[in-house]
């Protein structure tokens, strides 16, 4: 029997391995598109000319009249300006199954009177029409930088801070866009400016060179449509040797942004490991968590098999990245989120109100995280030499810290109401009532309210599920206000104990409906 069970335990990981394993056969190349990339030739030496070309590349990448492949090529041209040998940069990181990069040089000819003296050429010939297309008059539909709205002069910044700092400010912002462009496009602007703030405070990005919201959205749309551009940026992070002692300031800043890009889109997977498994609480022994634990073990093996590109499987759109979605291990994820909202206040803002949330496991996670005994790791007791007296005192302190806090956090996001019912008892045990009573919908509403009051404001999970069907989203704000008012009245009534029974029976029955409806909108 033990051998049979071990076979089932390893089936998930072995199944994933067999799916991802190559079946052999010939490798048939796919169709590749040609993308033009422009690099600076040795005759372009003036810093003002270089910065002008950089902003020209940025402007073309935002031109909605151009094809997305062309716009992506201009962003590649801009990123390549960070290196003394753009050709080597593209050769090292630009090998891609989707595109073939064709490199053109931009040279400066003092004898030319048009296009500011610039000419596009290769080793064999000059491209006059391409030059006019690249450097001809262009109308920006919106400002590239916020400083342009304030009539700030980038040339002044160039004189004060120098060309490398100004170019670095532009390129770093392109990298910051990648953090949210693929995995959270709806929150792109907010996420961009949140990440940018650290670089503004340390002076990396000057105010006059901060992208406008329209610029951020434009770059993000190109990144979402041009996977080859994203692959180039990921390869840049993978191949960049961080052990070098001669990293430029721009390369260091790219690595800092890279820390945000790594594991983008894998937050649920990482948080499940952190709060669900690494906390090593006794709840992991539950049989209904066993399948999800096996699934998580399989996903860990898959993740590690990807090597240095594993943190980027979501933004690279690796075929296996969908397997890491929390809907594939809902019970364990729900339990982990329950632990997380108790142990980490910041996680209370994390969106947990999803369709696959297992409410009982979510509440169980909160319950075990609040339990003083569960907070003590037996694995470290012997290693740290903790005495029995010290453990008892620690339990005493933990009990005092959590004493009186009976509130359970509701799921956030979706249709959930982000309020907690103070001192609400949560029943996680199976109920022995009839189906009608288990749903909290007995025939006599007065009896129901009396039972609820007598059990410390008891609300069942089954009642919450039943009420969810009868609660509209439009009622949310009104329900929140009434809950706050009723809870205040309830605390006042609890303070005046030993009241006559008649007063308790006279409580407005709407209070029960408010609390129960709140449970239906997000669960308690």
Swiss-Prot record:
GO cellular component: helical viral capsid; host cell cytoplasm; ribonucleoprotein complex; viral nucleocapsid
Keyword tags: Capsid protein, Helical capsid protein, Host cytoplasm, Ribonucleoprotein, RNA-binding, Viral nucleoprotein, Virion
Composition bias, Basic and acidic residues: 487-508
Function of the molecule: Forms the helical nucleocapsid (NC) in a ratio of 1 N per 6 ribonucleotides, protecting the genome from nucleases. The encapsidated genomic RNA serves as template for transcription and replication; encapsidation by N is coupled to RNA synthesis. Forms the encapsidation complex with the phosphoprotein protein P. Before encapsidation, the newly synthesized free N protein, so-called N0, is chaperoned by P.
Stretches the record annotates as Ncore: 1-404
Native organism taxonomy: Viruses, Riboviria, Orthornavirae, Negarnaviricota, Haploviricotina
Organism listed in the record: Sendai virus (strain Ohita)
Superkingdom of the organism of origin: Viruses
Assembly, per entry: Homomultimer; forms the nucleocapsid. Binds to the viral genomic RNA. N0 interacts with the phosphoprotein (via N-terminus); this interaction allows P to chaperon N0 to avoid N polymerization before encapsidation. Interacts as N-RNA template with the phosphoprotein (via C-terminus); this interaction positions the polymerase on the template.
Region ranges (Interaction with the phosphoprotein): 462-471
Protein family membership: Belongs to the paramyxoviruses nucleocapsid family.
Note: Most abundant protein in the virion. Since the viral RNA genome consists of 15,383 bases,there are 2564 molecules per encapsidated genome.
GO MF annotations in UniProt: RNA binding; structural molecule activity
Region listing for Ntail, in residue ranges: 405-524
Keyword Transmembrane: no
Amino acids binding RNA: 180, 190, 195, 260, 350, 354, 356
Pfam families in the cross-refs: Paramyxo_ncap (PF00973)
Stretches the record annotates as Disordered: 487-524
Protein name: Nucleoprotein
């Amino acid at each position: 029997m033990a051998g049979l069970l071990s076979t089932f335990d390893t089936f998930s990981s072995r199944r994933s391995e067999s799916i991802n394993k190559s079946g052999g056969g010939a490798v048939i190349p796919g169709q590749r598109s040609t993308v033009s990339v422009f690099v600076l030739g040795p005759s372009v030496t003036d810093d003002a000319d270089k910065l002008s070309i950089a902003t020209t590349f940025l402007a073309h990448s935002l031109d909605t009249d151009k094809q997305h492949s062309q716009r992506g090529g201009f962003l590649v041209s801009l990123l390549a300006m960070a290196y003394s040998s753009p050709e080597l940069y593209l050769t090292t990181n630009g090998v891609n199954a989707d595109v073939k990069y064709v490199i053109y040089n931009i040279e400066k000819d003092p004898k030319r009177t048009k296009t500011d003296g610039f000419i596009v050429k290769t080793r064999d010939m000059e491209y006059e029409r391409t030059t006019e297309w690249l450097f001809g008059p262009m109308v920006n539909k919106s400002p590239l930088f916020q400083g342009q709205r304030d009539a700030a002069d980038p040339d002044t910044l160039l004189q004060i801070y120098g060309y490398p700092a100004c170019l670095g400010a532009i390129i770093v912002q392109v990298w910051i866009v990648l953090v949210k462009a693929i995995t959270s496009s709806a929150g792109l602007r907010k996420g961009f400016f949140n990440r940018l703030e650290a670089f503004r405070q340390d002076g990396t990005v000057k105010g006059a060179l901060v992208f406008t919201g329209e610029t951020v959205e434009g770059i993000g749309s190109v990144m979402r449509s041009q996977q080859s551009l994203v692959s180039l940026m990921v390869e840049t992070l993978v191949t960049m040797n961080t052990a070098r002692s001669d990293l430029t300031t721009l390369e260091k800043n790219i690595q800092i942004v890279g820390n945000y890009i790594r594991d983008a889109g894998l937050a649920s997977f990482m948080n499940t490991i952190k709060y669900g498994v690494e906390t090593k609480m006794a709840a992991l022994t539950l049989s209904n968590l066993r399948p999800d634990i096996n699934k998580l073990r399989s996903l860990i093996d898959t993740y590690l098999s990807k090597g240095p590109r594993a943190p980027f499987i979501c933004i690279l759109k690796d075929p296996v990245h969908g397997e890491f979605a929390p809907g594939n291990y809902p019970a364990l994820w729900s339990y982990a989120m329950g632990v997380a909202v108790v142990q980490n206040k910041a996680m209370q803002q994390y969106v947990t109100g999803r369709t696959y949330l297992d409410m009982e496991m979510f509440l169980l996670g909160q319950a075990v995280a609040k339990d003083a005994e569960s907070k003590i790791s037996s694995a470290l007791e012997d290693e740290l030499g903790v005495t029995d007296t010290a453990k008892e005192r620690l339990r005493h302190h933990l009990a005092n810290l959590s004493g009186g806090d009976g509130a359970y956090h509701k799921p956030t996001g979706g249709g959930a109401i982000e309020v907690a019912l103070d001192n609400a008892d949560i029943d996680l045990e199976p109920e022995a009532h009839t189906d009608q009573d288990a749903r909290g919908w007995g025939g006599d509403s007065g009896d129901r309210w009396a039972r609820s009051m007598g059990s410390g404001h008891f609300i069942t999970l089954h009642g919450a599920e039943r009420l969810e069907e009868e609660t509209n989203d439009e009622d949310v704000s009104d329900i929140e206000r009434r809950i706050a008012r009723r809870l205040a009245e309830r605390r006042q009534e609890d303070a005046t104990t030993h009241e006559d029974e008649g007063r308790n029976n006279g409580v407005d029955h709407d209070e029960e409906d408010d609390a129960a409806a709140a449970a239906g909108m997000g669960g308690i």
